[in-house]
Amino acid sequence: SRPYSFGL
């Protein structure tokens, strides 16, 4: 959903 989709 986030524009910077990391696996955090």
UniProtKB/Swiss-Prot annotation:
A single cellular component GO annotation: extracellular region
Subcellular location as annotated: Secreted
BP GO annotations: neuropeptide signaling pathway
Leucine amide modification, residue list: 8
Keyword annotations: Amidation, Neuropeptide, Secreted
Family the entry assigns: Belongs to the allatostatin family.
Protein name: Cydiastatin-3
Species this chain originates from: Cydia pomonella
